Regions:
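Short alpha-helical segments that sit at the start of domains
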Residues: 2-36, 106-109
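Electrostatic, structured charged patches in enzyme active sites and in nucleic-acid/phosphate-binding
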Residues: 2-11, 117-393
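Short amphipathic alpha-helical interface segments
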Residues: 29-52, 56
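Short, well-structured alpha-helical interface segments that form or flank functional binding sites
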Residues: 37, 60, 111-114
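A short, highly charged nucleic-acid-interacting micro-segment common to nuclease
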Residues: 43, 100-117
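Short amphipathic alpha-helical interaction segments
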Residues: 52-73
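Accessory beta->alpha helical hairpin/"wing" motif in late/C-terminal subdomains of nucleic-acid enzymes
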Residues: 72-98
Length: 393
């Protein structure tokens, strides 16, 4: 059995000792805020791989909960799941929770759940509230809602749409789709109708779509592949990319994606970051060039950290129509190395620069991902949440 040490105020320690004494326990395990977040993440996602879970939490924290039989590792899914004990602990914590469901081991369901978990854990690390149980809670920002929580037998308000999550940042309301090689096709009209209907009551400056996957390479692998569609109602994601009127952003579910989401969570992030990067060289873009973020020494400047490649392409075309052969791009290191250099620098379309850590700290305060506090968890009644230790299986 692994041990976990939580520094707690003396009053909490006394209540902890009293609980053990009254219930005849020789010892008991006091749960921390971090423990509860692990359990909640598993309740929302259903299953999470060790890779994603141990990016936000330590291996010991995960193994502690496993030893206490609140979570277990599934060999079939190759991921962590909640146990009935873990669900009971969550139910006693006072949270509003989605319904507990029995795990499914069909391969398509496992794949879908693990992809969703990558989106959720990336958003969680970006400090986004992912613990929503209804769409109306998207009124607060930043927040993320999972439509599958409302998809059950006899009720499916989202129909056959493929949206994985809804994200509300300071300026954007986004429908997130998982897009990787072989992902298939979508009925775009149905997707946009459902997106509008389910978010109409939530004010946002701009609606957008996000294509997410494990990496930029996976997303572009699908977009660059192309495929022949027999059903005229359906479109490939490449066709969606070409025809969608809304802004379309690419998001990897990794550290870069976490930082990208944090940037997108800052109100007016495009102008603010352009001003930070260019300093005294900043000149506002022309009124008829909304795809630009600034002019730098007379050259169009695009802050590309949100990975709206279509906006970059529009900026390149607009600049060339004005007789300017190259624009200037600034983005995060992975974005520059894996996408922008090949597409824009090597083709002579742009000079590409990496956004410095100093500029990011000026915008965000800190570039470190969110971590929950290492403090004891208190219920709404002010008591600590404790459970008797169980024998390790």
């Amino acid at each position: 059995m692994f041990a976990e040490i939580v520094i707690a105020p003396e009053t909490a320690q006394e209540r902890f000792r009293q609980t053990a004494g009254m219930k005849g326990w020789k010892s008991c395990m006091m749960l921390s805020c971090r423990d509860l977040d692990i359990l909640r993440l598993l309740r929302w996602c259903r299953m999470i791989r060790s890779k994603e879970l141990c990016e936000a939490f330590s291996k010991d924290e995960v193994l502690n909960l496993s030893a206490a039989q609140m979570i277990r590792f599934s060999d079939a899914a190759k991921a962590w799941l909640l146990t009935p004990c873990g669900n009971r602990v969550l139910d006693s914590a006072g949270f509003v929770l989605p319904p507990a469901t029995a795990p499914t081991y069909r391969e398509p369901d496992i794949t879908r759940r693990l992809r969703l978990a990558q989106i959720v854990t990336t958003a969680y690390a970006a400090g986004i509230n992912i613990f929503l149980t209804k769409e109306s809670e998207l009124q607060s920002t930043p927040s993320l809602f999972l439509p599958f929580l409302h998809r059950n037998r006899g009720s499916n308000p989202w129909g056959s749409t493929r949206v994985a999550a809804l994200l509300h940042t300071s300026d954007l309301m986004c429908a997130i789709h998982w897009v990787s090689p072989g992902i298939g096709c979508v009925a775009l009209t149905d997707e946009l109708t459902a997106f509008q209907n389910h978010t109409a009551a939530i004010p946002a400056k701009q609606r957008a779509m996000i294509f997410a996957a494990s990496s930029y390479e996976e997303i572009l692998g699908e977009l660059d592949a192309g495929q022949e569609i027999q059903n005229t109602r359906l479109q490939s994601y490449r066709e969606v990319y070409d025809c969608l009127k809304l802004p379309l952003l690419l998001l990897p579910c990794n550290e870069t994606g976490c930082l990208q989401l944090r940037i997108m969570g800052v109100p007016n992030y495009r102008e603010l970051l352009a001003r930070i990067i260019l300093k005294s060289h900043y000149v506002p873009p022309p009124a008829n060039r909304a795809m630009y973020d600034a002019l730098y020494q007379g050259v169009p400047f695009v802050m590309a950290a949100d990975m709206d490649l279509r906006r970059i392409d529009a900026a390149v075309e607009a600049a060339r129509s004005d007789g300017i052969l190259q624009i200037v791009l600034a983005a995060l290191p992975e974005q520059v190395e894996t996408v922008l250099n090949r597409r824009y620098r090597e083709t002579g379309k742009a000079r590409v620069f990496t956004i410095t850590d100093a500029a990011l700290r000026e915008l965000l305060g800190s570039t470190a991902p969110y971590t929950p506090p290492d403090l004891p968890f208190y219920t709404s009644e002010g008591s600590v949440l404790d459970v008797p230790p169980l024998k390790a299986p």
